[in-house]
Amino acid sequence: MNKALLPLLLCCFIFPASGKDAGWQWYNEKINPKEKENKPVPAAPRQEPDIMQKLAALQTATKRALYEAILYPGVDNFVKYFRLQNYWAQQAGLFTMSARKAMLAHPELDYNLQYSHYNGTVRNQLAADQAQQRQAIAKLAEHYGIMFFYRGQDPIDGQLAQVINGFRDTYGLSVIPVSVDGVINPLLPDSRTDQGQAQRLGVKYFPAMMLVDPKQGSVRPLSYGFISQDDLAKQFLNVSEDFKPNF
């Protein structure tokens, strides 16, 4: 081969190799990027009305139906009202049944376990209550002296003196009666006249029963005003337990 043609041949092989693949350029169309699809925004879920709003709406609808049935009597108006009324009755029945079912699942919530509401158990329940009251009276009597401040000329105080007398006999309780006006009630012949005890103990309202701790020099009110014997026994229990609720 002519040495003069060799460089020319090399150039023919080199230039096509360094260029782009022109043979496919007619097919390589410019691809436009796809536009981002706008997906529809899902509709917000429908919110249920607040329970208080729902209750108020039902109550208003029931009242309105009742008033319409009264002011504009007719079959349609009455049926509209009565259907709403039956709805309330049905819901009340479901509530009652769910409560009974709940008491079986959670007996600790059943009030009937502590205080039976059946008439047949009243006698036993009263006996248990009275036993607690007796224990409370005995407990307080061990730590406190019991003083009864009264006015001998007041008829209500005189009526309470009868209760105090009966209470002392029933429970064997020692009570010190004190007349603040100097008039001794004949039902309480062991009464003392007030020599400043009421003022020292801070008793300003009468009649009054006070618990006095001679060791500590403290005083606790037990009752003011007239009170029956049964309620006085309950009051001893309440004071001894610092008025702890029994429900």
Swiss-Prot record:
It is found in: Periplasm. One of its GO terms (cellular component) is periplasmic space. Residues 1-19 form the signal peptide. Keywords: Conjugation, Periplasm, Plasmid, Signal. It holds the Pfam family TraF. Transmembrane segments: none annotated. InterPro entries: TraF, TraF/TrbB. Involved in F pilus assembly. This is Protein TraF. It comes from Escherichia coli (strain K12). The gene is traF.
